[in-house]
């Protein structure tokens, strides 16, 4: 089956990964001209960690992540007001925890499927029309 996924963030490439394994032809479409950089730091643990491990990506995600040792609360003046040692998270998750930039997670998943999917950057899905033989997808730029 041919499948179009709109968005190359985290969910789009992750879905593309599993659909490709299932034998589907995947087209990823991203409005940005390239993979996005930056973004916020996410705490990576629990089911997301388990899935990345199943995908064979957890080593790279941990390498790119920050092994945070302390969480600090600071005032407007920049002085520490409180905080705690985050080793409690390590104990609670059996050391299956890292903090990693969102764009690094996205890029790691995308690299795992690059060459196995078709990716279009700088465009987005404009519409879809059901046809007798399937769906017709139109794009903003193409």
Where are these regions (language model features)?
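Adenine-nucleotide cofactor-binding loop residues
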Residues: 11, 32, 126
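Conserved SAM/SAH-binding loop-helix junction
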Residues: 14
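Glycine-rich FAD pyrophosphate-binding loop
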Residues: 6, 20-40
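Conserved N-terminal helical subregion
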Residues: 1-3, 20-22, 45-142
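Beta1/beta-strand and adjacent pyrophosphate-binding region of the FAD-binding site
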Residues: 1-11
